[in-house]
Amino acid sequence: MKIGVIGGGQLGRMLALAGTPLGMNFAFLDPAPDACAQALGEHIRADYGDQDHLRQLADEVDLVTFEFESVPAETVAFLSQFVPVYPSAESLRIARDRWFEKSMFKDLGIPTPEFADIQSQADLDAAVASIGLPAVMKTRTLGYDGKGQKVLRKPEDVSGAFAELGSVPCILEGFVPFSGEVSLVAVRGRDGETRFYPLVHNTHDSGILSLSIASTAHPLQALAEDYVGRVLKQLDYVGVLAFEFFEVDGGLKANEIAPRVHLSLIHI
């Protein structure tokens, strides 16, 4: 089997390192000339929206996946016309946009911090009046490793915050006094069979994941599996999905999902 991967970075590389011993071959589409995964398969150097090269990739492989959620959903939708793509374009559309993501959690009855859509400074002012401070403002898309977000602690932080984050669509989330952050990684096949990994406790340094410690018998494992299972079923998901939670008062509140392989699986 030959697998096409959108993105040739560290996660694509680790995906290939795991798949090669199983007899799988890989092709990576990535605009970077030094994409680190290229030593493990064919490197198609092209932008993610380059339809000619996307079609080339589709013609060469049996199926396509992606290593990170910053890939445009339109890219996945285009590829889906010619080759199976997992996870689906709809899964990516929701997971890459915090508003769609949080709205799905709410619809599925999964606890998540209070949130509001922000399209202007006036929206932000109204949301702060409703949700209160402290709160966290995040861009709806493209934020990662602490980027694309700002903590608002006092009224002076609110003025100009929308412009500070680039005057792009954002969400405002109520601040969560959490005791820890945990993540659960699940895998769901095309036949619906699902497997869950042990719940992992994550430690961050300046917004970047620095340490993940797995638990063999975490008291919140079953609850996390229930919440993740709801999302997998809703999206008819195929592939690997990571779900990050805040631990709050003996329960869990949803933070975000990642529709891909995840660094929290590299744990001790």
Give, region by region, the residue ranges found by the protein language model.
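Hydrophobic/aromatic residues located in beta-strands of well-ordered beta-sheets
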Residues: F26, V85, F196, K253-A254
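Conserved metal-phosphate-binding beta-hairpin within the catalytic cores
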Residues: D236-S264
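Active-site nucleotide/adenylate-binding loops and adjacent lid/helix of ATP-dependent enzymes
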Residues: I94-S183, V187-Q234
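Active-site flanking residues adjacent to catalytic metal/cofactor-binding acidic residues
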Residues: L29, F66, M137, E173, ...
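ATP-binding N-terminal substructure of ATP-dependent carboxylate-amine bond-forming enzymes
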Residues: M1-F100, D107, A122
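Conserved small/polar residues in nucleotide/adenosyl-binding loops
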Residues: I266-I268
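Anionic group-transfer/hydrolysis microenvironments
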Residues: A32, E69, R140, F175, ...
